[in-house]
UniProtKB/Swiss-Prot annotation:
GO BP, one annotated term: malonyl-CoA biosynthetic process
PROSITE patterns: COA_CT_NTER
Keywords associated with the record: ATP-binding, Cytoplasm, Fatty acid biosynthesis, Fatty acid metabolism, Lipid biosynthesis, Lipid metabolism, Metal-binding, Nucleotide-binding, Transferase, Zinc, Zinc-finger
Cofactor annotation comment: Binds 1 zinc ion per subunit.
Protein's UniProt name: Acetyl-coenzyme A carboxylase carboxyl transferase subunit beta
Gene Ontology CC: acetate CoA-transferase complex
Gene that produces this protein: accD
Assembly, per entry: Acetyl-CoA carboxylase is a heterohexamer composed of biotin carboxyl carrier protein (AccB), biotin carboxylase (AccC) and two subunits each of ACCase subunit alpha (AccA) and ACCase subunit beta (AccD).
Taxonomic classification: Bacteria, Pseudomonadati, Pseudomonadota, Gammaproteobacteria, Alteromonadales
Catalytic activity entry: N(6)-carboxybiotinyl-L-lysyl-[protein] + acetyl-CoA = N(6)-biotinyl-L-lysyl-[protein] + malonyl-CoA
Species of provenance: Pseudoalteromonas translucida (strain TAC 125)
Function in brief: Component of the acetyl coenzyme A carboxylase (ACC) complex. Biotin carboxylase (BC) catalyzes the carboxylation of biotin on its carrier protein (BCCP) and then the CO(2) group is transferred by the transcarboxylase to acetyl-CoA to form malonyl-CoA.
Binding residues for Zn(2+): C28, C31, C47, C50
């Protein structure tokens, strides 16, 4: 032992590097900032560094949006069926099972009724993680169930779209949902009940070509991709470079395709004020309540 080792205090080796539990941190998909997940969830999955609106599940979106305590889910009796016995690289029934397992949902639309700042409403939200939020028979059935509740109880309807379009595995059945949902919304118009469409990233295909663009007010979240065919498909077809930001909500607002852009963190307050004006309701939450 050297003289230096004799005069220095003995040290012990660390038992090992402490592992950080999984799920504590998240990475912004826009600016790559590392974010504390609990704080990100409080901000409704909007990055506090760059304000990028990350995708969230349809169920979580409705839980953020509707008042706590009296939310009732609609259309739970509807479940997908492989009527056509469709098969591509795998069976449609197997795709349904896999999507249900990965998303935790039975199909691509969650529908609820409840209150928004005391105003009785029905709200639906697409679940993009379920086969790209594709519109199929169950989506149409649940959407119509929500409309029927609005017609019965004189309530407005809010829809949060996040979809790649019609579900090819249901062929013509999925395309018929475009007409089915549009016809249901026509009944809302006849009765003078507001329908607000909120288009989130992405809202494409048959959904954008039907119910998503039929709102009395059409809203986009910041930088949401909204259109029919995607920009790459269009560029390959027309053989031209598209303008910067083409099909983003800011581009659509500038060209009059949507009415407004609302930050997700301000969605509840803004839509509650709009609905109060639409329905000639008092401004206080208590006065909106139905006896």
């Amino acid at each position: 032992m050297s003289w230096l080792e004799k005069i220095l205090p003995k040290t012990t080796k660390a038992s090992g590097r402490k592992e950080i539990p999984e799920g504590v941190w998240a990475k912004c998909t826009s600016c790559d900032s590392i974010l504390y997940k609990a704080e990100l969830e409080k901000a409704l999955n909007v990055c506090p560094k760059c304000d990028h609106h990350m995708r969230i599940s349809g169920r979580k979106r409705l839980e953020y949006f509707l008042d706590e305590g009296d939310r009732v889910e609609l259309g739970t009796q509807h479940e997908p069926k492989d009527v056509l016995k469709f098969r591509d690289s795998k069976k449609y029934s197997d795709r349904i099972t896999a999507a249900q397992k990965s998303s935790g949902e039975k199909d691509a639309l969650v529908a609820m009724k409840g209150h928004l700042k005391g105003i009785p409403v029905a709200a639906v939200a697409f679940e993009f993680s379920f086969m790209g939020g594709s519109m199929a028979s169950v989506v149409g059935a649940r959407f119509v169930d929500a409309v029927d509740q609005c017609l019965e109880h004189n309530m407005p309807l809010i829809c949060f779209s996040a979809s790649g379009g019609a579900r090819m595995q249901e062929a013509l059945i999925s395309l018929m949902q475009m007409a089915k949902t549009s016809a249901a919304l026509a009944k809302m118009t006849e009765k003078g009940l507001p329908f607000i469409s909120v288009m989130t990233d992405p809202t494409m295909g048959g959904v954008s070509a039907s119910l998503a663009m039929l709102g009395d007010i059409n809203v986009g979240e910041p930088k949401a991709l909204i259109g029919f065919a995607g920009p790459r498909v269009i560029e390959q077809t027309v053989r031209e470079t598209l303008p910067e930001g083409f099909q983003r909500s800011e581009f659509l607002l500038e060209h009059g395709a949507i009415d407004m852009i609302i930050d997700r963190r301000e969605m509840r307050d803004t839509l509650a004020r709009i609905l109060a004006k639409f329905m000639n309701l008092p401004s206080t939450e208590q006065e909106h309540r139905v006896a």
